[in-house]
Amino acid sequence: MNWATMDDKPPANRKGPPRSEIHAEQGKPIAPPTTAGEPRGTLLALWVEERGESECPAVMDGIRAETLPDAKAGRLPRGHSWRDNLDKSLYGGKQMTAMDAKAFDAGAPSRAAQMWDRANWSDIEAEVKRLQLRIAKAVREGRWGKVKALQRLLTRSHGGKMLAVKRVTENRGKRTPGVDGRIWSLPAARRKGMLSLRHRGYRAMPLRRVYIPKSNGKKRPLGIPCMRCRAMQALWKLALEPVAETLADANSYGFRPERSTADAIEQCFNVLAKRASPEWILEGDIRGCFDNFSHSWFLENIPMDKEVLRKWLQAGYIDEGTLFESQAGTPQGGVISPVIANMALDGLEAAVDASVGTSTLVRRKAQLNVVRYADDFVVTGVSKDVLESRVLPAVRQFMAARGLELSEEKTRITNIAAGFDFLGQNVRKYDGKLLIKPANKSIKSLLDKVRGIIKDNASATQEALIRQLNPVIRGWAQYHRHVVSKVTFSSIDSHIWRWLWKWAKRRHPMKGARWVRQRYFRRDGYRFWDFATKGSTEGDTCGLQLFRAATVVIQRHVKVRGLANPFDPAWDTYFARRRTAKRSARLPGATPWC
């Protein structure tokens, strides 16, 4: 039945005026007629699709979601409509008025803002998670046609688009614009941005090139997408992440949900701590990893919409007003870049194992283990010869297929007795005992940053200085709290105290040491030299205090299981217990979690 050719006239067996005559004056949306024996939900879908795509994707999603149950029931429940279903799924069961519906379709800013704030995010996240679980299940079953269909369903769903916009407008980069200079800070702008996430006619805008300093003094280039491209990438990340997690290497820990650098360091301890553990380590360094990935490899192997992926990869970037083409690589700064980079490097463990043969006994004797965090990785081996003659050529071949190469200067093979640095930690055996401590480079970087803050705030108030120092010291200490770092923490506190004493003395050259001490240092229990402001009330000796790294409790980290998948329902109980144990460990006086 083609309603588009009937000029909106009802069938002969239907009484009453055409629906086209009952319209905006009543403040209600136009709906197509129904015929006896045909489900209304099915007719709604046919009527809207044949007349062209609705101006509001939410309408289409509500109609399509309603079609399946209607086909079984034969008709809608009395007193219900597709608007009611849309209200219940997105707005927590609140009834949408005629004025709300008109504002939703027309995009009125005030009403759109209210409806964005009224969205039931828990239900939206649950619906997206259900689709992600179905995608992961299809991957495990090898049903790639179903994977593609479910990805298409998720990336075109109203809930998926809303969640994608929510994530890019609430993360740390929400106030960083792209080349168009726009940010979606208001609810009305977010809703409008959500409606713009359409695949038909989508064009990726060039990236805005910015540079951030590296630890070696050089600068790292970042590509900042515009908000619409960012939201589109976040939308596809929702659909691609279940695939990536299901196919990922067991000992890959970078930019993955429920994993961290602490898991990678703990895996190093697990494979190197025993006396019979391998003693040789290959430290791998990929030259310009994110800048040199092969676009052709991505397009051939990443299971997503190829046209959308090609537009992202070839969008180019603008640097100082000049447009540059992108011939290779994926931009650092893109929402989806870590996911596709991880997928490109997955398979490294299998390539390393295959380098010594197919025999399980031979592999076990070679003692090969791979620990990878994004583009940083180490490989253990029983001897230097095995790593040099077997493993290293296999790794080079693996990287070459993806357009990458190892850095000859930074890739080296070392003995565990000499130690190696990995993710800011130094891993080394002392007389047969493995100790993991903060790396000297990491310590120097922290002290240089603290010294710079103190120097730049020579004339600032004590309170302003403390507020700048505390996040830096606390963040560094929290990162290193899982390794042997208690002595290091005390040493750092000592250095910082001496610099602050000089800072205080320099501000008052005509005052004595006793006066300076009483002005800037307070007593806290048995401590007489805490750098702190004066208390605001009587009896309160200390106000705002400088955070001391030595107060951080050392806690042994429990590594996540290698095969644990957050998109597999079989692991839900495991992750729930793990999150509960982590929260409990943060409470005062809590014991290390396990």
Question: Which role does the model predict for each range below?
Answer:
Residues R402-W476:
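A conserved non-catalytic segment of reverse transcriptases
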Residues N2, D7, I22, E66, ...:
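Right-hand nucleic-acid polymerase module
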Residues M1-R191:
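Non-catalytic, polymerase-adjacent accessory regions of viral genome-replication enzymes
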Residues S196, R200, L247-N251, F255-R259, ...:
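Conserved polymerase palm-domain catalytic core
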Residues L186-A204:
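Amphipathic alpha-helical blocks
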Residues D493-W499, A504-W593:
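Extended C-terminal regions of large enzymes
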Residues R203-S215, R310-E325, R467-N470:
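Active-site-adjacent bridging/hinge elements
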